[in-house]
Amino acid sequence: NKPAGKLPAQATSSKVSIDQSGNIARSIKSGTNVNSLLQSINEKQYCEIRKNNVKQSGNVSVGTGMQLCVINNNKVVKSYNIIVTGDTNGDGKTNITDLIAVKQSILGRSSLSNIQKQAADMNNDGKVNITDFIKVKAKILGRE
């Protein structure tokens, strides 16, 4: 049911922050499912959410590392890496696993990928530090 007319080359939204040059979709809350994310995209009828290049649907949780893809004639014309705030492990939730990952990164015991760092950067200051650790902890405890 794709409407006739000009096919979009990119995704836009007033609810999700979409970085066209960096190919990133962020400001997505943990616990968001595929249906609700697609509803927040203006070009939803042309978009898919994929994980490891497999289309996701319905109530599947959207996680960091999935892709928002704009589709034209069954081909991906633009793809955005999804960043779910607080979700470093890609399960779509912010939980103790994410808190431990942030702690280990701060202590230098493990490193996060660029996308994981962006998910862990809760205050969007470009760094992963104790402030982010406290914010992840507060989110888990329901104090955010």
Task: Map each language-model feature to its residues.
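Cellulosome-associated attachment modules in secreted, modular CAZymes
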Residues: 3-6, 14-31, 35-144
